[in-house]
Amino acid sequence: MSEHKKLLKNGMWDNNPALVQLLGLCPLLAVSSTVTNALGLGIATLLVLVGSNVTVSLIRNYVPKEIRIPVFVMIIASLVTCVQLLMNAYAYGLYLSLGIFIPLIVTNCIIIGRAEAYASKNDPLPAALDGFWMGMGMTTVLVVLGAMREIIGNGTLFDGADLLLGEWASALRIQVFQFDSSFLLALLPPGAFIGVGLLIALKNVIDTQLKARQPKQEKPAIERARVTNA
Protein backbone atom coordinates (compact mmCIF):
# COMPACT_ATOMS: atom_id res chain seq x y z
CA MET A 1 0.00 0.00 0.00
CA SER A 2 1.37 3.43 -0.98
CA GLU A 3 2.01 6.06 1.67
CA HIS A 4 -0.79 8.26 0.32
CA LYS A 5 -3.35 5.44 0.50
CA LYS A 6 -2.16 4.56 3.98
CA LEU A 7 -2.63 8.16 5.16
CA LEU A 8 -6.08 8.28 3.54
CA LYS A 9 -7.14 5.00 5.19
CA ASN A 10 -5.81 6.07 8.57
CA GLY A 11 -7.41 9.51 8.54
CA MET A 12 -10.80 8.52 7.17
CA TRP A 13 -11.28 5.16 8.89
CA ASP A 14 -8.62 3.14 10.74
CA ASN A 15 -7.37 5.99 12.94
CA ASN A 16 -10.22 8.48 12.55
CA PRO A 17 -9.65 11.30 15.06
CA ALA A 18 -13.29 11.40 16.17
CA LEU A 19 -14.38 7.75 16.09
CA VAL A 20 -11.13 5.98 17.02
CA GLN A 21 -8.86 8.46 18.81
CA LEU A 22 -11.86 10.26 20.38
CA LEU A 23 -10.08 13.60 20.16
CA GLY A 24 -11.72 17.00 19.80
CA LEU A 25 -14.96 15.82 21.40
CA CYS A 26 -15.77 19.23 22.92
CA PRO A 27 -16.36 21.05 19.60
CA LEU A 28 -17.66 17.84 18.00
CA LEU A 29 -20.47 17.58 20.54
CA ALA A 30 -21.18 21.29 20.99
CA VAL A 31 -21.18 22.59 17.42
CA SER A 32 -22.65 19.73 15.38
CA SER A 33 -26.29 20.72 15.86
CA THR A 34 -26.58 21.65 12.16
CA VAL A 35 -24.74 20.71 8.98
CA THR A 36 -23.72 24.33 8.41
CA ASN A 37 -22.05 24.72 11.80
CA ALA A 38 -20.40 21.31 11.50
CA LEU A 39 -19.06 22.01 8.02
CA GLY A 40 -17.80 25.45 9.01
CA LEU A 41 -15.87 24.16 12.00
CA GLY A 42 -14.64 21.15 10.02
CA ILE A 43 -13.21 23.32 7.25
CA ALA A 44 -11.55 25.62 9.79
CA THR A 45 -9.99 22.65 11.59
CA LEU A 46 -8.82 21.12 8.30
CA LEU A 47 -7.11 24.35 7.21
CA VAL A 48 -5.32 24.67 10.54
CA LEU A 49 -4.29 21.00 10.46
CA VAL A 50 -2.75 21.24 7.00
CA GLY A 51 -1.07 24.58 7.72
CA SER A 52 0.37 23.52 11.07
CA ASN A 53 1.62 20.17 9.74
CA VAL A 54 3.42 21.81 6.81
CA THR A 55 4.93 24.56 8.99
CA VAL A 56 6.08 22.15 11.69
CA SER A 57 7.59 19.85 9.06
CA LEU A 58 9.53 22.74 7.51
CA ILE A 59 11.07 23.88 10.80
CA ARG A 60 11.44 20.47 12.45
CA ASN A 61 15.24 20.44 12.12
CA TYR A 62 15.66 23.94 13.56
CA VAL A 63 13.57 23.73 16.75
CA PRO A 64 15.21 22.27 19.88
CA LYS A 65 13.31 19.33 21.29
CA GLU A 66 13.06 20.99 24.70
CA ILE A 67 10.85 23.83 23.41
CA ARG A 68 9.09 22.13 20.50
CA ILE A 69 5.64 21.98 22.15
CA PRO A 70 5.44 25.75 22.92
CA VAL A 71 6.64 26.47 19.38
CA PHE A 72 3.99 24.16 17.91
CA VAL A 73 1.28 25.85 20.00
CA MET A 74 2.40 29.30 18.81
CA ILE A 75 2.23 28.14 15.18
CA ILE A 76 -1.24 26.67 15.68
CA ALA A 77 -2.46 29.79 17.49
CA SER A 78 -1.21 32.01 14.65
CA LEU A 79 -3.01 29.90 12.04
CA VAL A 80 -6.22 29.81 14.09
CA THR A 81 -6.11 33.60 14.36
CA CYS A 82 -5.82 33.88 10.57
CA VAL A 83 -8.76 31.50 10.06
CA GLN A 84 -10.79 33.39 12.66
CA LEU A 85 -10.15 36.73 10.92
CA LEU A 86 -11.07 35.26 7.52
CA MET A 87 -14.30 33.82 8.91
CA ASN A 88 -15.09 37.13 10.60
CA ALA A 89 -14.63 38.91 7.27
CA TYR A 90 -16.35 36.52 4.86
CA ALA A 91 -18.75 34.41 6.97
CA TYR A 92 -19.74 36.70 9.82
CA GLY A 93 -23.01 34.94 10.60
CA LEU A 94 -21.26 31.60 10.97
CA TYR A 95 -18.49 33.30 12.95
CA LEU A 96 -21.09 34.46 15.48
CA SER A 97 -22.76 31.05 15.52
CA LEU A 98 -19.54 29.13 16.25
CA GLY A 99 -18.40 31.69 18.81
CA ILE A 100 -15.72 30.56 21.24
CA PHE A 101 -15.20 27.24 19.47
CA ILE A 102 -13.15 28.87 16.70
CA PRO A 103 -10.32 30.08 18.99
CA LEU A 104 -10.62 26.82 20.95
CA ILE A 105 -9.22 25.04 17.88
CA VAL A 106 -5.83 26.02 19.35
CA THR A 107 -6.34 23.50 22.17
CA ASN A 108 -7.65 20.74 19.90
CA CYS A 109 -5.62 17.61 20.67
CA ILE A 110 -5.90 16.43 17.06
CA ILE A 111 -3.78 19.30 15.77
CA ILE A 112 -1.02 19.26 18.37
CA GLY A 113 -1.05 15.46 18.29
CA ARG A 114 -0.44 15.25 14.53
CA ALA A 115 2.20 17.97 14.72
CA GLU A 116 4.10 16.01 17.37
CA ALA A 117 3.48 12.45 16.18
CA TYR A 118 3.80 12.87 12.40
CA ALA A 119 4.69 16.32 11.05
CA SER A 120 7.79 16.73 13.23
CA LYS A 121 9.19 13.46 11.84
CA ASN A 122 8.30 13.67 8.13
CA ASP A 123 8.76 15.82 5.02
CA PRO A 124 6.27 18.62 4.16
CA LEU A 125 4.29 16.74 1.47
CA PRO A 126 3.47 13.66 3.59
CA ALA A 127 2.79 15.98 6.53
CA ALA A 128 0.34 18.00 4.42
CA LEU A 129 -1.42 14.82 3.27
CA ASP A 130 -1.61 13.56 6.85
CA GLY A 131 -3.17 16.84 7.98
CA PHE A 132 -5.59 16.85 5.05
CA TRP A 133 -6.90 13.33 5.59
CA MET A 134 -7.09 13.67 9.36
CA GLY A 135 -9.00 16.91 8.84
CA MET A 136 -11.27 15.26 6.28
CA GLY A 137 -11.95 12.41 8.70
CA MET A 138 -12.93 14.86 11.42
CA THR A 139 -15.02 16.98 9.03
CA THR A 140 -16.85 13.92 7.71
CA VAL A 141 -17.87 12.82 11.20
CA LEU A 142 -18.91 16.39 12.06
CA VAL A 143 -21.11 16.67 8.96
CA VAL A 144 -22.70 13.23 9.39
CA LEU A 145 -23.43 13.91 13.06
CA GLY A 146 -24.71 17.40 12.22
CA ALA A 147 -27.02 15.99 9.55
CA MET A 148 -28.40 13.38 11.94
CA ARG A 149 -29.08 15.90 14.68
CA GLU A 150 -30.52 18.54 12.35
CA ILE A 151 -32.92 16.12 10.66
CA ILE A 152 -34.11 14.56 13.93
CA GLY A 153 -34.18 17.83 15.85
CA ASN A 154 -35.58 20.31 13.32
CA GLY A 155 -36.63 18.19 10.35
CA THR A 156 -34.38 20.24 8.05
CA LEU A 157 -31.09 19.86 6.22
CA PHE A 158 -28.61 22.61 5.24
CA ASP A 159 -30.56 25.18 7.23
CA GLY A 160 -28.50 28.38 7.37
CA ALA A 161 -26.14 27.29 4.59
CA ASP A 162 -26.12 30.90 3.39
CA LEU A 163 -24.12 31.81 6.53
CA LEU A 164 -21.20 29.78 5.15
CA LEU A 165 -21.60 29.79 1.37
CA GLY A 166 -23.41 33.06 0.65
CA GLU A 167 -27.00 34.01 -0.12
CA TRP A 168 -27.27 31.64 -3.09
CA ALA A 169 -26.92 28.70 -0.67
CA SER A 170 -30.27 29.49 0.97
CA ALA A 171 -31.80 27.45 -1.88
CA LEU A 172 -30.03 24.35 -0.54
CA ARG A 173 -32.32 24.18 2.51
CA ILE A 174 -34.37 20.97 2.54
CA GLN A 175 -37.45 20.43 4.69
CA VAL A 176 -37.28 16.69 5.45
CA PHE A 177 -39.99 16.60 8.12
CA GLN A 178 -42.49 19.14 9.37
CA PHE A 179 -42.33 19.48 13.16
CA ASP A 180 -44.59 21.64 15.29
CA SER A 181 -41.69 22.10 17.72
CA SER A 182 -38.04 21.10 17.76
CA PHE A 183 -36.95 17.80 19.30
CA LEU A 184 -34.55 19.27 21.84
CA LEU A 185 -32.89 16.00 22.86
CA ALA A 186 -31.28 15.75 19.42
CA LEU A 187 -30.14 19.38 19.45
CA LEU A 188 -28.67 19.44 22.95
CA PRO A 189 -25.41 17.77 24.13
CA PRO A 190 -27.12 14.51 25.24
CA GLY A 191 -28.25 13.97 21.66
CA ALA A 192 -24.70 14.58 20.47
CA PHE A 193 -23.35 11.94 22.87
CA ILE A 194 -25.95 9.44 21.69
CA GLY A 195 -25.18 10.23 18.05
CA VAL A 196 -21.43 9.80 18.49
CA GLY A 197 -22.02 6.53 20.33
CA LEU A 198 -24.17 5.23 17.47
CA LEU A 199 -21.54 6.20 14.89
CA ILE A 200 -18.78 4.48 16.88
CA ALA A 201 -20.95 1.37 17.25
CA LEU A 202 -21.69 1.37 13.51
CA LYS A 203 -17.98 1.62 12.69
CA ASN A 204 -17.19 -1.26 15.04
CA VAL A 205 -19.89 -3.43 13.44
CA ILE A 206 -18.53 -2.69 9.95
CA ASP A 207 -14.97 -3.44 11.08
CA THR A 208 -16.12 -6.75 12.59
CA GLN A 209 -17.94 -7.73 9.39
CA LEU A 210 -14.94 -6.84 7.22
CA LYS A 211 -12.61 -8.80 9.48
CA ALA A 212 -14.90 -11.84 9.37
CA ARG A 213 -14.90 -11.82 5.56
CA GLN A 214 -11.13 -11.87 5.29
CA PRO A 215 -9.73 -15.35 4.55
CA LYS A 216 -8.10 -16.89 7.56
CA GLN A 217 -4.47 -17.76 7.08
CA GLU A 218 -3.77 -21.22 8.43
CA LYS A 219 -0.38 -21.51 10.01
CA PRO A 220 1.50 -24.61 8.85
CA ALA A 221 2.07 -27.18 11.57
CA ILE A 222 5.69 -27.30 12.65
CA GLU A 223 6.95 -30.75 13.58
CA ARG A 224 9.09 -30.71 16.66
CA ALA A 225 12.56 -32.11 16.23
CA ARG A 226 13.55 -35.05 18.39
CA VAL A 227 16.38 -33.97 20.67
CA THR A 228 16.72 -36.99 22.96
CA ASN A 229 19.02 -39.87 22.26
CA ALA A 230 17.50 -43.17 21.23
Curated annotation (Swiss-Prot):
InterPro entries: NqrDE/RnfAE (IPR003667), RnfE (IPR010968). Its EC number is 7.-.-.-. One of its GO terms (cellular component) is plasma membrane. It comes from the Bacteria. The chain crosses the membrane at residues 39-59, 69-89, 93-113, 125-145, 182-202. Its main location: membrane. Belongs to the NqrDE/RnfAE family. It holds the Pfam family Rnf-Nqr. This is Ion-translocating oxidoreductase complex subunit E. Keywords: Cell inner membrane, Cell membrane, Electron transport, Membrane, Translocase, Transmembrane, Transmembrane helix, Transport. It comes from Vibrio vulnificus (strain YJ016). It is a multi-pass membrane protein. The keyword Lyase does not apply. It is found in: Cell inner membrane. One of its GO terms (biological process) is electron transport chain. It is an enzyme of class 7 (translocase). Part of a membrane-bound complex that couples electron transfer with translocation of ions across the membrane. Coiled coil: none annotated.
